[in-house]
């Protein structure tokens, strides 16, 4: 018999390489066929609920790394909750209406303006449904466990019907109204935009200082040769000027420059003088802003008057302190104009071109008018200064083109009547990171009314009829009737039925004596779609619960889904749709740049999966601090792959060395474990406690760091490092070996459970090698935290020993550098401890030679020799061990051949082999 045949060498079929791109797909197929999602929920019936509501991604194209970050984060949370005593369903959703779908059809040559509306919308539906299926396949491949057979999609009939009911309830409460006011207008999309659909970019613009001749100074300012000076970055709005706004609290200076006088805010005078180039000027008069109200000026180009009015939005940050006011082209302008009954003059059409309301500009694009106005003001002698100015300007988030403020007649949701209620609900919810609460609170506090109408085709129609005299018709009866039709036929019914067919049978109105009605042509803002999901999904669906426990999305959703959902939910029910909000940063490249095809830094999840596997993306998510922006590159993913290999290989070692361990037969009770094994069991238990607490805070980064640190330092670099001397060498069923196997097996089981939410495919593979009752680790529960009576004392003593171990390892390293020894097992170590350290070592009662991996260890009560290396609480002497290397245990021993029957072995190995392999004594032993 060969020596290796007398060793307990670990064996396992768990492969070193994961072959993840292939094996993951096999596991996912198995999960689907065995309905693991349904099985897990059935196990959790009757347990406390946890409802994470999925914010719907837009169905357009394959998923990107931002999608992966979001969906994997949600999956980790839901998997954890299900394994930790909660009934945690997860229904994935998709946002399917809106401009991107229309843009895709336009690229294919489909013209919405010439095609029948119902047929056009059917093409939109088909495209959107194809995109949903494409993304669903991508999300499944990430290993996301969800109710994939029953997703919610905003184009579903029942969803659209419930959205109509939400609108109807808000209308009934008086929160919906029709009005004309400036809104974000996208000429490139030919539609209004919500705040969440606008992104800001730095652009260059013409900034101009313009002189408006004073015509009436109310007897305070002499109008002769006197001018109000305004500053604007939108010269194209000058034709729509109706007023000049001043702050009543500011002082204004009348400044003599040559034979003319100019009025500017005193606090900006020096800055304005420098900008315009007034080298020689003199303040001849100071006037309070409050005294300037109702003064008048002449428009510098057109034959019209401009009224001086008051507004507290006027600041001393930029400009002149006198603000050009065009109520048809700005929100502040509109609001202040309402107080003075100023005309809402907005002579620009849906394409961004001037109308015949300004005949000479008819058909001109506003950006061309911008240049023309500069020239006209120059020709009129009213242009004091032209300067190119860089500022942050709103753009359409889809088309990337600039937007304008334009007064149009739209439908709005009024926020003011229930703003305080919304703010109160924000206070009651919790936010991760905590700054999210302040951010959302300030957004709601400062936001204006929500423009909910859109001039597009693909969306949920506004369920409004018009009577013969133009009166809007919305009643509880009409709303419910439309909702029921939509439940059966979908919202396309609005375009395939007449108004009469869509109204309740026999419906009449005093506003339509002839019984004639027409339908609203606009659709609802897509944010009203997703913003109603709390009702259409969480409130309405069986098995789900409202309000949701958690909303988790990117930080851009504070002005998007977090915002719109909150408004509709509080408007209808009085409460927030969520108890907690978790926001994440954006995915950037390793240099902090956004992903873009032009930069060539786009990383596709599907490409990563084909090369590395979804587990590597999942590990990347768990390693990242997602509360701020998250970096990704192939290099970063390679680091995640290295971490994965370390985890996998450690598990492989643990599985190999517990393959002959039956937890039901061989487990050693905690009180009977050796001291070092108790120490590791306690360390493992503390790790589980910390990981469960981190999971409860949705802090995957801490979970991963702590687990990886335990695997790398406590297991690989310590416990499993010296384990071979026991696991391989000792008798198979010896107490020391079974004690150590108990801990290693516990670590494998508990770490597999803890890591399942993060690495479900790999942990499922590992679970197949463990001897547990559950067929799948996902059907097991999270490990329970034990309470060990000797916890504190044990950790305290072992912490002291670990400090001593570090010092001894340094002494061994010194001996290695001095060529006294090669590897540590060649050493004979003598430790001279002080009294406290000696007491600690006696208390621990461990095999310290085994733990230090040396051939001989002596704990001496004698005084340390002068050449001993002084440590903090002991002295140490390292020498080369005397004797020969035992070919079985690889230790240097002086008792080789002590047993004549087994002359090549040391006494320890001879005893083990003779007792367990009696045939060896007869047949002899080969190397």
UniProtKB/Swiss-Prot annotation:
Entry's cofactor comment: Binds 1 zinc ion per subunit.
UniProt subcellular location: Cytoplasm
Residues at which L-isoleucyl-5'-AMP binds: 553
SUPFAM superfamilies: Anticodon-binding domain of a subclass of class I aminoacyl-tRNA synthetases, Nucleotidylyl transferase, ValRS/IleRS/LeuRS editing domain
Assigned keywords, A-Z: Aminoacyl-tRNA synthetase, ATP-binding, Cytoplasm, Ligase, Metal-binding, Nucleotide-binding, Protein biosynthesis, Zinc
CDD domains tied to this protein: Anticodon_Ia_Ile_BEm, IleRS_core
Keyword Transferase: no
Pfam family, one: Anticodon_1
UniProt GO cellular component terms: cytosol
Cited InterPro entries: aa-tRNA-synth_I_CS, aa-tRNA-synth_Ia, Anticodon_Ile_BEm, Ile-tRNA-ligase, Ile-tRNA-ligase_type1, Ile-tRNA_ligase, M/V/L/I-tRNA-synth_anticd-bd, Rossmann-like_a/b/a_fold
Gene Ontology biological-process annotations: isoleucyl-tRNA aminoacylation
Motif 'KMSKS' region boundaries: 594-598
Co-factor(s): Zn(2+)
Enzyme class per UniProt: ligase
Binding site for Zn(2+): 886, 889, 906, 909
EC number(s) reported in the record: 6.1.1.5
Motif interval(s): 'HIGH' region: 57-67
GO molecular function: aminoacyl-tRNA deacylase activity; ATP binding; isoleucine-tRNA ligase activity; tRNA binding; zinc ion binding
Reactions mediated catalytically: tRNA(Ile) + L-isoleucine + ATP = L-isoleucyl-tRNA(Ile) + AMP + diphosphate
Gene3D superfamilies: 1.10.730.20, HUPs (3.40.50.620), Ile-tRNA synthetase CP2 domain-like (1.10.10.830)
Residues that, per the record, bind ATP: 597
Subunit and interaction comment: Monomer.
Domain comment (free text): IleRS has two distinct active sites: one for aminoacylation and one for editing. The misactivated valine is translocated from the active site to the editing site, which sterically excludes the correctly activated isoleucine. The single editing site contains two valyl binding pockets, one specific for each substrate (Val-AMP or Val-tRNA(Ile)).
Job description of the protein: Catalyzes the attachment of isoleucine to tRNA(Ile). As IleRS can inadvertently accommodate and process structurally similar amino acids such as valine, to avoid such errors it has two additional distinct tRNA(Ile)-dependent editing activities. One activity is designated as 'pretransfer' editing and involves the hydrolysis of activated Val-AMP. The other activity is designated 'posttransfer' editing and involves deacylation of mischarged Val-tRNA(Ile).
Family: Belongs to the class-I aminoacyl-tRNA synthetase family. IleS type 1 subfamily.
Protein name (Swiss-Prot/TrEMBL): Isoleucine--tRNA ligase
Protein's organism: Lactobacillus helveticus (strain DPC 4571)
Lineage: Bacteria, Bacillati, Bacillota, Bacilli, Lactobacillales
Gene expressing this chain: ileS
């Amino acid at each position: 018999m060969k020596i290796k045949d007398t060793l307990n060498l670990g064996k396992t079929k768990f492969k070193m390489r994961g072959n993840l791109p292939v094996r993951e797909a096999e596991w996912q197929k198995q999960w689907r066929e065995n309905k693991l999602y349904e099985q897990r929920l059935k196990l959790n019936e009757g347990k406390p609920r946890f409802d994470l509501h999925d914010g719907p991604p837009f169905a357009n194209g394959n998923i990107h790394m931002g999608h992966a970050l979001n969906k994997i984060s949600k999956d980790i949370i839901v998997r954890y909750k299900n394994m930790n005593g909660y009934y945690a369903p997860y229904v994935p959703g998709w946002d399917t209406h809106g401009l991107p779908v229309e843009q895709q059809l336009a690229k294919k040559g489909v013209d919405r303006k010439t095609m029948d509306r119902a047929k056009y919308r059917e093409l939109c539906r088909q495209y959107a449904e194809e995109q949903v299926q494409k993304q669903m396949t991508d999300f499944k491949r990430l290993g996301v466990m969800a109710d994939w057979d029953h997703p919610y999609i905003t184009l579903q009939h029942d969803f659209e019907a419930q959205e109509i009911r939400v609108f109807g309830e808000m209308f009934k409460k008086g929160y919906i109204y029709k009005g004309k006011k400036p809104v974000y207008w996208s000429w490139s999309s030919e539609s209004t935009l919500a705040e969440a659909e606008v992104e800001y970019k730095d652009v260059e613009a013409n900034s101009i200082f313009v002189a408006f001749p004073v015509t009436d100074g109310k007897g305070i300012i002499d109008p002769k040769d006197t001018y109000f000076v305004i500053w604007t970055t939108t010269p194209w709005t000058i034709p729509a000027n109706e007023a000049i706004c001043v702050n009543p609290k500011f002082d204004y200076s009348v400044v003599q420059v040559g034979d003319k006088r100019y009025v500017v805010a005193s606090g900006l005078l020096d800055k304005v003088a420098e900008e315009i180039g007034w080298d020689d000027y003199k303040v001849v008069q100071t006037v309070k802003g409050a005294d300037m109200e109702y003064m008048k000026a002449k428009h510098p180009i057109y034959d019209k008057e401009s009224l001086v009015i008051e507004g507290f939005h006027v600041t001393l940050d930029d400009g002149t302190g006198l603000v050009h006011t065009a109520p048809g082209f700005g929100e502040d302008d509109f609001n202040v104009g309402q107080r003075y009954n100023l005309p809402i003059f907005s002579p620009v059409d849906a394409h961004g071109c001037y109308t015949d309301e300004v005949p000479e500009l008819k058909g001109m694009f506003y950006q061309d008018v911008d240049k023309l106005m500069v020239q006209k003001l120059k020709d009129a002698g009213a242009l004091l200064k032209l300067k190119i100015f860089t500022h942050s300007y709103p753009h359409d988030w889809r088309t990337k083109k600039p937007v304008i403020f334009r007064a149009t007649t739209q439908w709005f949701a009024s926020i003011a009547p229930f703003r305080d209620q919304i703010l109160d609900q924000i206070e009651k919810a919790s936010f991760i990171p905590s700054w999210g609460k302040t951010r959302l609170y300030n957004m709601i506090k400062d936001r204006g009314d929500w423009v909910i109408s859109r001039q597009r085709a693909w969306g949920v129609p506004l369920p409004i009829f018009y009577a013969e005299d133009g009166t809007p018709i919305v009643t509880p009866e009409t709303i419910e009737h439309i909702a029921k039709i939509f439940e059966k036929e979908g919202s396309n019914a609005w375009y395939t039925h007449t108004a009469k067919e869509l109204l309740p049978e026999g419906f009449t109105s005093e506003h339509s004596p002839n019984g004639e009605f027409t339908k609203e042509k606009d659709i609802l803002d897509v944010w009203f779609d997703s913003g109603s999901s709390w009702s259409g999904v969480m409130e309405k669906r069986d098995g789900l619960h409202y309000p949701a426990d958690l909303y988790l999305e990117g930080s851009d959703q504070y002005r998007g889904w977090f915002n719109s959902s909150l408004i509709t939910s509080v408007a209808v029910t009085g409460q927030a749709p969520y108890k907690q909000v978790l926001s994440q940063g954006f995915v950037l490249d390793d240099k902090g740049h956004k992903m873009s095809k032009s930069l060539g830094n786009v990383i596709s999840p599907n490409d990563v999966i084909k090369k590395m596997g979804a587990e590597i993306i999942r590990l990347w998510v768990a390693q990242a601090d997602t509360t701020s922006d998250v970096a990704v590159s192939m290099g970063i993913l390679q680091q995640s792959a290295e971490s994965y290999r370390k985890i996998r290989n450690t598990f492989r070692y643990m599985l190999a060395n517990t393959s002959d361990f039956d937890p039901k037969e061989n487990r050693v009770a905690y009180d009977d474990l050796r001291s070092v094994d108790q120490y590791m069991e306690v360390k493992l238990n503390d790790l589980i406690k910390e990981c469960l607490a981190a999971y409860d805070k949705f802090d995957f980064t801490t979970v991963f760091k702590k687990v990886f640190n335990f695997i790398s330092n406590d297991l690989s670099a310590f416990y499993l490092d010296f384990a071979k001397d026991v696991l391989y060498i000792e008798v198979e069923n010896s107490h020391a070996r079974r004690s150590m196997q108990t801990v290693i097996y516990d670590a494998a089981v508990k770490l597999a459970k803890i890591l399942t939410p993060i690495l479900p495919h790999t942990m499922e593979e590992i679970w197949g090698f463990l001897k547990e009752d559950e067929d799948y680790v996902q059907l097991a529960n999270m490990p329970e935290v034990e309470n060990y009576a000797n916890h504190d004392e044990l950790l305290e003593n072992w912490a002291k020993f670990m400090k001593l171990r570090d010092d001894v390892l340094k002494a061994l390293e010194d001996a290695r550098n001095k060529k006294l020894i090669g590897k540590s097992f060649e050493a004979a170590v003598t430790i001279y401890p002080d009294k406290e350290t000696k007491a600690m070592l006696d208390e621990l009662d461990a095999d310290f030679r085994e733990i230090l991996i040396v051939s001989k260890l002596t704990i001496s009560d004698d005084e340390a020799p002068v050449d001993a290396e002084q440590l903090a609480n002991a002295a140490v002497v390292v020498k080369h061990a005397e004797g020969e290397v035992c070919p079985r245990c690889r230790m240097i021993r002086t008792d080789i051949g002590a047993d004549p029957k087994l002359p090549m072995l040391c006494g320890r190995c001879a005893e083990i082999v003779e007792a367990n392999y009696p045939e060896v004594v007869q047949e002899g032993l080969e190397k």
